[in-house]
C-alpha cells in the first residue's frame, strides 16, 4: 500500500512540474505553463480575449 501512495505522489509531482499546454518540464520560476506557451497564450492568437465591440 505504501508503494502505491509513493507512486501516486511521484506522478503528482511530475505532473505539477510540467507545462499544462505542451508537457515540457517547467523552470523553477514557471507555474502551470512554460515561458513559450505563456507568450503564445498571452498573444491571444484566436482573439478570444478581446471584448466584442458594441455598435449601440
Swiss-Prot record:
It comes from the Viruses. Pfam families: NinF. Belongs to the ninF family. This is Protein ninF. It comes from Escherichia phage lambda (Bacteriophage lambda).
